[in-house]
């Protein structure tokens, strides 16, 4: 999903350049954004919004970063993300790339109930699992403490 982040950052660079008066650079980044987005859609997205990487992360990034072109693709991607969330019992199934955006992807696409359901999940891996285990800070791992109260030694 590095491509998704590249496209997102290129769009941000375009806006930043325009904001500071670098119109020529802004136009260049805007053109690069268009080319990269078109490539992304042709390579990774089907007509009905399915992505070649069928994961929570892929759909969350595509929705959050506005990488889908048609309402049909957006609706299809959202439905697939909802299905993947249900399949995973609303536990977080993203890595570092998708975790910061998955709740926004739901909320910004009128699926706020899914965002709240994922946020309220207490089974590992979830945002509330560490809280249910007494955490007062962010853990390095979802399961730093095991259900029996022992520290996870890792592997």
Task: Go through each PLM region and give its residues.
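Active-site core of glycosidic bond-cleaving carbohydrate-active enzymes
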Residues: 1-155
